């Protein structure tokens, strides 16, 4: 389960991939498959969530790792070179590392 909390000590990444509409689902499927087969088994991986922009031109990945060092180790793994090359070939990726500042839930969802 994804835990989004300003009290968490997780390393959070938001990846925004700008794509041509014909590549949106293709990229999302690729990201999901690589995550299922390899990334989720790596040390420090917590979660990944993929979102398709209604405009057909964006895939957004919200990912969490136990630490930035765990994320960097994944990124340096040579088994993922083809994955990153594919992503760059079908999209313009933008990676943003974040700290969770605030979260809110609806009153009907257990929030105040």
Region annotations inferred by a language model:
Residues 11-18, 47-77:
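Short, well-ordered beta-strand segments in beta-rich or mixed alpha/beta enzyme
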Residues 18-31:
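Short, surface-exposed ligand-recognition loops at beta-strand->loop->(often short) alpha-helix junctions
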Residues 1-10, 49-57, 83-112:
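Glycine-rich beta-strand-turn "strand-cap" elements at beta-sheet edges
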Residues 33-46, 64-97:
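An amphipathic, aromatic/His-enriched active-site/gating alpha helix that lines ligand/cofactor pockets
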């Amino acid at each position: 389960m994804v835990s989004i909390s300003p009290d968490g000590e997780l390393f959070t990444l938001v990846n925004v991939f700008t794509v041509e509409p014909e590549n949106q689902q293709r990229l999302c499927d690729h990201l999901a498959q690589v995550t299922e087969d390899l990334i989720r088994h790596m040390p420090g991986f917590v979660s990944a969530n993929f979102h398709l922009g209604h405009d057909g031109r964006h895939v957004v990945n919200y990912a969490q790792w136990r630490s930035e060092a765990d994320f960097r180790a994944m990124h340096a793994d040579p088994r993922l070179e083809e994955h990153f090359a594919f992503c760059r070939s079908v999209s313009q990726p933008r990676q943003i590392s974040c700290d969770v500042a605030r979260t809110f839930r609806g009153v009907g969802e257990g929030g105040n």
